[in-house]
């Protein structure tokens, strides 16, 4: 059985700074996704089909490489090291099951539903603040402030602190970008330390006087007599902050961009906002995943499809390719019958995104409100895309909203 290192594979470097927008989509589309299922990248290998992606996301012989990255960059102490070691994405086995059993009820669909009225209220406030002609940068006007307000509501934090929460989330999530770790580590460390201090005050206030918020729910969470420690609680809240702000901002912006580029789909959504808002969210997650690659590192030799991946091999699972497999033609269609299981944007297996229900609800309420309030959406300039090395978002999205 050949080693993966012995194979002649197409090479793809998704970290190239200029690989954005149309260039990014063209480069991704050129990679094989049917006959060929594997490519090489600067760090290891990229898996290009859904079945193989599911395997590497679910196998116990591969884990998220957060601890390896910390060692590689010499992160051996301090708040960032503490966060990486205790982050639920880097915890496995029985410890991971225990944490998920404690946190899942607080983020179940029914629990998330109680935040929907606030989501609608925030969308109304942000839309009311648009100029009368409806011309704006959708990212700065709505997509950026909206999830920060939602996460403040979810945490039970003052809404006035939403910009600070966005600032911390923006910096903390850069720990997943190797380039940022090399050039901006001190700023990432500072953001982690500042957020820890901030949430410690919130936790201390909630213990004697719980409210109807996530922190209170996690403080009271209990499974067979077990409760979260203080460090576990603060790291789960940090994880939810990072997963609930930048990712939601980027995915919502892409959803609106896609609807602006496909006016027929916008009119379908306008005709049935309540029925098609969630399918529109699912189609945006499938078509333009803001986490196009999910990393794993082999902790033992892995044999798959007659190939041996040696221990230490880094594998990137391409949700972009997996989400498209078997779909012909590959068009953005919010009325198509797409099985949710086909989408790997939130991952798969035990490390499936803990905040997926919250993210879906945020985007669903935002699109539903816009469809009820806005008659048409059109691009008012060229979108500015970010890089695909971490979260693949939009720096700006100039649009015109006919209110």
Description of each model-found segment:
Residues 1-403:
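Cytochrome P450
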């Amino acid at each position: 059985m050949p080693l993966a290192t012995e194979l002649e594979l197409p090479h793809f470097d998704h970290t190239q700074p200029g690989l954005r927008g149309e260039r990014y989509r063209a480069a991704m589309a050129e990679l094989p996704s049917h006959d060929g299922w594997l490519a090489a990248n600067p760090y290891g290998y990229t898996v290009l089909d859904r079945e193989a992606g599911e395997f590497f996301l679910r196998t116990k012989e591969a884990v998220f490489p957060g601890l390896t990255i910390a060692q590689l960059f010499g992160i051996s102490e301090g708040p960032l090291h503490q966060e990486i070691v205790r982050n639920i994405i880097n915890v496995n086995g029985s410890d991971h099951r225990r944490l998920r059993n404690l946190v899942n009820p607080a983020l179940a669909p029914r629990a998330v539903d109680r935040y929907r009225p606030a989501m609608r209220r925030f969308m109304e406030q942000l839309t009311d603040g648009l100029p009368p002609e409806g011309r704006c940068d959708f990212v700065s006007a709505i997509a950026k402030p909206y999830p920060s307000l939602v996460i403040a509501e979810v945490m039970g934090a003052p809404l006035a602190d939403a910009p600070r929460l966005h600032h911390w989330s923006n910096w903390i999530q850069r720990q997943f970008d190797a380039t940022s770790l090399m050039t901006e580590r001190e700023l990432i460390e500072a953001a982690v330390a500042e957020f820890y201090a901030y949430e410690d005050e919130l936790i201390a206030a909630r213990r004697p006087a719980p409210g109807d918020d996530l922190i209170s729910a996690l403080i009271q969470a209990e499974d067979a007599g077990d409760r979260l420690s203080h460090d576990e609680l603060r790291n789960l809240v940090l994880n939810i902050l990072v997963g609930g702000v930048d990712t939601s901002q980027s995915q919502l912006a892409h959803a609106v961009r896609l609807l602006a580029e496909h006016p027929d789909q916008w009119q379908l959504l306008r005709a049935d906002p309540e029925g098609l808002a969630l399918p529109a969210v699912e189609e945006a997650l499938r078509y333009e995943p803001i986490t196009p690659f999910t990393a794993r590192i082999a902790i033992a030799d892995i044999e798959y499809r007659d190939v041996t991946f040696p221990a230490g091999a880094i594998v990137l699972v391409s949700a972009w390719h997996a989400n498209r497999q078997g779909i012909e033609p590959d068009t953005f269609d919010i009325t198509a019958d797409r099985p949710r299981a086909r989408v790997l944007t939130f991952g798969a297996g035990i490390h499936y995104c803990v905040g997926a229900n919250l993210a879906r609800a945020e985007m669903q309420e935002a699109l539903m409100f816009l469809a009820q309030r806005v008659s048409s959406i059109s691009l008012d300039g060229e979108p500015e895309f970010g890089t695909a090395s971490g979260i693949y978002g939009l720096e700006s999205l100039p649009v015109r909203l006919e209110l």
